[in-house]
């Protein structure tokens, strides 16, 4: 507001000049270059774009945020571009640290509808625990998973030094059952996926897949005590529901490994 009179004075002065004077000043001060027309970014062509299936997978432990809206819409645009399927999957398997809110399931559905997003299918992970247990048992049967009872400090040292865990060679079927029947308490045992103990990234070495929960605050399932961690449940669901492409932040890039 304060600059308006000054700007008007300068404009009037320039307008009072003849064309040659204006050109001379333009040469002295340099012309303002007109920016080149920038084409809008086009969606990159995806590999294996036949029968595209994408998923938006929030934890319903609160209302939808702008951070949620971005991947929700990205996936929706991909689904629309390739005439694929869009899955809304509630990653609600943390009933203790980040327990879901019962009303939040509806909040997400309503807000996605407001954004113009219509999921092809809705999946609730907490209702698929038996499926996750089944896959876990199959992995145990083939030696692909084991129940670890090492304390966190000892386990950290073993993984850091790429040393085989002594729990690997123990009879796993009983140890897995003991996670459910109360023999093991929360923090005393976890089921781990057996991987390459020499993997360059320590986070990928024998990672935890299931843990025992002592304080279950889940609004849909308050009785279960053994719960899958995100990476395990997510991998199973991506496989079962034939997810073809995943849009996620750099912070989750390690999941690709």
Protein language model features and the residues they cover:
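N-terminal Rossmann-like or analogous alpha/beta NTP/dinucleotide-binding catalytic cores
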Residues: 1-166, 251-257
């Amino acid at each position: 507001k304060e600059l308006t009179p000054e700007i008007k004075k300068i404009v009037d002065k320039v307008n009072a000049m003849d064309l040659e004077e204006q050109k001379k000043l333009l040469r002295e001060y340099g012309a303002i270059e007109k920016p080149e027309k920038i084409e809008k970014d086009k969606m990159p062509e995806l590999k294996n774009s036949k029968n595209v299936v994408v998923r938006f997978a929030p934890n319903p432990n609160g209302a939808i945020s702008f951070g949620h809206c971005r991947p929700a819409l990205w996936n929706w645009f991909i689904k629309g571009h390739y005439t694929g399927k869009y899955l809304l999957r509630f990653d609600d398997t943390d009933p203790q640290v980040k327990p879901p809110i019962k009303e939040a399931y509806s909040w997400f559905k309503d807000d996605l509808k407001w954004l113009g997003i219509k999921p092809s299918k809705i999946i609730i992970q907490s209702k698929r625990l038996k499926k996750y247990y089944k896959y876990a048992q199959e992995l145990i049967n083939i030696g692909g998973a084991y129940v670890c009872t090492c304390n966190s400090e000892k386990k950290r040292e073993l993984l850091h030094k790429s040393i085989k865990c002594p729990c690997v060679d123990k009879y796993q079927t009983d140890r897995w059952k003991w996670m459910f029947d109360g023999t093991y308490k929360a923090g005393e045992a976890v089921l781990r996926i057996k991987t390459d103990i020499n993997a360059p990234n320590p986070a990928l070495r024998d990672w935890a897949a299931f843990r025992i929960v002592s304080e279950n605050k889940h609004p849909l399932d308050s009785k279960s005590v053994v719960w899958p961690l995100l990476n395990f449940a997510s991998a199973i669901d991506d496989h079962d529901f034939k997810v073809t492409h995943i849009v996620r932040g750099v912070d989750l890039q390690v999941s690709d490994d």
